[in-house]
UniProtKB/Swiss-Prot annotation:
Residues 36-207 are virion surface. The chain crosses the membrane at residues 208-228. Keywords: Glycoprotein, Host endoplasmic reticulum, Host Golgi apparatus, Host membrane, Host-virus interaction, Membrane, Secreted, Signal, Transmembrane, Transmembrane helix, Viral attachment to host cell, Viral envelope protein, Virion, Virus entry into host cell. This is Glycoprotein 2a. One of its GO terms (biological process) is symbiont entry into host cell. The keyword Signal applies. Pfam families: PRRSV_Env. InterPro entries: Arteri_GP2a. It is a single-pass type I membrane protein. Heterotrimer of GP2a, GP3, and GP4. The GP2a-GP3-GP4 complex associates with the E protein. Interacts with host CD163; this interaction plays a role in virus entry into host cell. It comes from the Viruses. It comes from Porcine reproductive and respiratory syndrome virus (strain Lelystad). It is found in: Virion membrane; Host endoplasmic reticulum membrane; Host Golgi apparatus membrane; Secreted.
Length: 249
């Protein structure tokens, strides 16, 4: 906040707000209702309660498939294919989508990494075996994130673009139907006997291995090139190569 001198005329006050600060304080009360949401009978604060309450309850519940599926089914009507209109209608909605997308990505990555670690280090050094893939596909979290990927890829393209892990997982055995009469997304879940496809996990693991190998190879190549092209770099690491000296007779 900027302040300026009152001047010589007023001796009672020594500081007064500048014109830019006054404009900010005048515009803020008019823009506050738009940021809080549409008016309702309960007031503007009801927007915060109904928007953030389901999210905190989702995080508090145990990380199981039925709890998260039930929570996200209640939030599906808030999702629309038209992302700009959804962002204008709920200004804080996009901020929550970005935060929860990183949260989900970290959780699923941690669970898959733990499973791979308990399966043995050989799974990372060789081609992934059928037993490891079967163990991964048997987790409830995998089925749940496949369900989320199917929902978000069809109705929440903004959120789906930020879920790197979910895009690599299979979007299988879950069909979506948008009911125009009820204005909501209806889900058709697969039968309990179906299992996720293992080829998608193999492709994801191969892509992870390829990215790690390419990053390491590029780093080593860059170091070798700099080592050969910049002689001063050798002395930084303490290597002094002998040079030929010619003595004149």
């Amino acid at each position: 906040m900027q302040w300026g001198h009152c001047g010589v005329k007023s001796a009672s006050c020594s500081w007064t707000p500048s014109l830019s600060s006054l404009l900010v304080w005048l515009i803020l009360p008019f823009s506050l209702p738009y940021c809080l949401g549409s008016p309702s009978q309960d007031g503007y604060w009801s927007f915060f309660s109904e928007w953030f309450a389901p999210r905190f309850s989702v995080r508090a519940l145990p990380f199981t498939l039925p709890n998260y599926r039930r929570s996200y089914e209640g939030l599906l009507p808030n999702c629309r294919p038209d992302v700009p209109q959804f962002a204008v209608k709920h200004p804080l909605g996009m901020f929550w989508h970005m935060r929860v997308s990183h949260l989900i990505d970290e959780m699923v990555s941690r669970r898959i990494y733990q499973t791979m670690e308990h399966s043995g280090q050989a799974a990372w050094k060789q081609v992934v075996g059928e037993a490891t893939l079967t163990k991964l596909s048997g987790l409830d979290i995998v089925t749940h994130f496949q369900h989320l990927a199917a929902v978000e890829a069809d109705s929440c393209r903004f959120l789906s673009s930020r879920l790197v892990m979910l895009k690599n997982l299979a979007v299988g055995n879950v069909s979506l139907q948008y009911n125009t009469t009820l204005d909501r997304v209806e889900l058709i879940f697969p039968t309990p006997g179906t299992r996720p496809k293992l080829t998608d996990f193999r492709q994801w693991l191969i892509s992870v291995h390829a990215s790690i190998f390419s990053s390491v190879a590029s780093s080593v190549t860059l170091f070798i090139v700099l080592w050969l092209r910049i002689p001063a770099l050798r002395y930084v690491f303490g290597f002094h190569w002998p040079t030929a000296t010619h003595h004149s007779s």
